[in-house]
Amino acid sequence: MSKQINAIRGMNDLYGDQSHAFDYLVQTAESVLKQYGFQSIRLPIVEKTELFARSIGEVTDIVEKEMYTFEDRNGDSLTLRPEGTAGCVRAVIQNGLAHNQIQKLYYTGPMFRHERPQKGRYRQFNQFGVEVFGIESVDIDAELIALSARLWERLGLQNLELQINSLGSQAARQAYRDILVAYFEEHKSQLDEDSLRRLSTNPLRILDTKNPDMKALVEAAPKLMDHLDEASKQHYEELKAHLDDLGVAYVENPNLVRGLDYYNRTVFEWVTTELGAQGTVCAGGRYDGLVEQIGGKPTPAVGFAMGIERLMALLMDNELVHEENGPDVYMVLAGDSTKRPGLVISEQIRENLPDIKVQMNCGGGSFKSQFKKADKSGARIALVLGEDEVNQKQIAVKYLREEREQEMVPWDQMVTLLKTALTESK
């Protein structure tokens, strides 16, 4: 017997309830986004490595340590995408989608990072990304946050906290960076190994440390908010005013900096305490310089990404996936002569009642075993077809979830009965 081949560590199969929760989440998100005028875009999983080095930043943890990068047969360096925004920006530039027009786009799919797998953090994970191009005013920032809040409401998710901050302009952030480096240089002995490395590469990320021993040091650090340019201050105040008008509660977090270099001004995260250390389920912000940085014309842009696996965990832990995944009708067949008419009847139901899910018993089995399968499937009705029923062109209708008598129905009346029993009662 050959040795069993398993999935790669940190890359998981989704099936059963997980797969259903995945579909439910994506379908709900798509319905909300379409209410706000968004359109879908499909993006490649593999991009040129240069794209991520230019956009995310060469000295970020993602580019330095976490990307799956390889050379193809032509010697080109390619990378499995670690996030979706850079690829979406590349597509917008390449296809001229943002030329003198506003684009509101969303996408979903797998991302890849070589991290240490743990609950809520995987090497292959799925994201739902939302991006807007061509709007500079702060009202679109507020609308995106309101959109995410609307999605949580639609899903029934509670206990999510919105944290917001402003990173200001690139010039203001550079000036603040120098101030921050000087502060941490004075307290270098208190920095952990990771922060010492970031001090020379990406010092703002020190503010995002999860090391409890550095909490007091970080809290006492100079605040970026005190060094913002006037335009960014006004932008931030207007954002808060919009959120107040919309009734979206928020917490100001001066240490919220995000792990990607391309953000400016608005940044935000939705966090929960229900998932342990990996508490961020949605994060985003404004990235007005990224389109130009990747080779396009200057274009304001803002967006966010949701971690699908983390949101799935919240939905399943709180039993919020309500839609039934099993069939409505289970077809029980007795005898070889019932297989062909059973198949025809099943197709007639699907053709006339497309919202009704029909599962036909295949592979034989006794009446008893078939009824066990029907009951286990969650079906509300079992249609029973034996040789006598075939000869009489009738079918027995057995109600599995109601105290009702079994009845015999002519084939030509079956669709009408099912429509009344199932469709009108849904």
From Swiss-Prot:
Catalytic activity field: tRNA(His) + L-histidine + ATP = L-histidyl-tRNA(His) + AMP + diphosphate + H(+)
GO cellular component: cytoplasm
UniProt keyword annotation of Nucleotide-binding present: yes
Localization per record: Cytoplasm
GO biological process, one term: histidyl-tRNA aminoacylation
GO terms of molecular function: ATP binding; histidine-tRNA ligase activity
InterPro entries per the UniProt record, alphabetical: aa-tRNA-synth_II, aa-tRNA-synth_II/BPL/LPL, Anticodon-bd, Anticodon-bd_dom_sf, His-tRNA-ligase, HisRS-like_core, HisRS/HisZ, HisRS_anticodon
Class of the enzyme per the UniProt entry, highest EC level: ligase
Keywords: Aminoacyl-tRNA synthetase, ATP-binding, Cytoplasm, Ligase, Nucleotide-binding, Protein biosynthesis
Keyword Secreted appears in the UniProt entry: no
Entry's EC annotation: 6.1.1.21
Subunit comment: Homodimer.
Protein name as it appears in the record: Histidine--tRNA ligase
Organism annotation: Hydrogenovibrio crunogenus (strain DSM 25203 / XCL-2) (Thiomicrospira crunogena)
